């Protein structure tokens, strides 16, 4: 469920 602002673009985290 990557619909949280933190996970939607968390690729290089």
From Swiss-Prot:
GO cellular component terms, semicolon-separated: viral capsid
Name of the protein described by the UniProt record: Capsid protein VP1/VP2
Its job? Capsid protein self-assembles to form an icosahedral capsid with a T=1 symmetry, about 22 nm in diameter, and consisting of 60 copies of size variants of the capsid proteins, which differ in the N-terminushe capsid encapsulates the genomic ssDNA. Capsid proteins are responsible for the attachment to host cell receptors. This attachment induces virion internalization predominantly through clathrin-dependent endocytosis.
Alphabetically ordered keywords of this record: Capsid protein, Clathrin-mediated endocytosis of virus by host, Host-virus interaction, Viral attachment to host cell, Viral penetration into host cytoplasm, Viral penetration via permeabilization of host membrane, Virion, Virus endocytosis by host, Virus entry into host cell
Q: Name one GO biological process term.
A: clathrin-dependent endocytosis of virus by host cell
**Protein location:** Virion
């Amino acid at each position: 469920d990557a619909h949280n602002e933190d996970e939607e673009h968390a690729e290089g985290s």
